[in-house]
């Protein structure tokens, strides 16, 4: 029978060190996996909470897919995480959140889905060394020359020429401007009016209305219709925009509509009882109506992740933006070198598989804005038809 040596304090210490070494070796692969964080600052409470959640859901869906593929950056295994912070749609809160995201979570990129917050971050992001992933179509976002900004959707100005030509061809060249009165709508009108006139059109009435505070638009619409327009320019959030269209039809208007990109045709159709009242309207392509195979597959996958829900533009654009951002990190070989990551965004978008780029982003221009095609949609004979936005190839 073999006798065991007594466990002296020295032998116990030696055994403990050996066990620790074995445990460390076993845990090595797990410890080697770095966590790469992407920030999000947007509305997650208040009236715009659902909008902010739609954006975040698209981002989180992308991260789940990326992590399932065991990603590597710079030869190291990584896990991607989104760090979401609520800014209540308040730019000052966005700025506070960004400071926290960069200092505490070391985020190299922060996605913000509203222009006020984007502009707030652009005052400091180059100095603080983080990329602004900007989900807004306001042209000034990339016109300012910020070297660390990605504008995720196309500029809304890319819609003006093709949308105008479409309704002019179907209905005529007289337009009445009855959009909303908030800053974003004012920016749209300021760009749309000269674009319409450049094509030989005439603006016969201008009557902005408070879409966010009213549901009765009969008075404002009646004033515009008194000038006998062929087309109405409308736009704000989807529900009030739909009510403007509905009330215009009830007042006898038979013409077309240019719908600014804040409103979505499929969401409007649910308010007015289908596409028939929207006949002749043109706006951005609803994700739910895009018939491209890769888009239909995206809608199906989204429905499995979020049962009973249909994705909109907010989910789709930002889903692809996260895929592109991580791909840019991989191409740059770094999750922290923001200049190198930003420089690889064009190549990253171009290298994405169609299934993770259902919106068909073609790349990124020298100012940091995405390049797209076929994002317009019009209602003809009660159905959606695609309209090429050739101004932004």
Q: Where do the model's predicted regions map?
A:
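Sec/Tat signal peptide C-region and signal peptidase I cleavage site
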Residues: 26-32
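Twin-arginine (Tat) signal peptide motif
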Residues: 4-19, 23-26
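Extracytosolic ligand-binding ectodomains
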Residues: 2-4, 15-18, 32-393
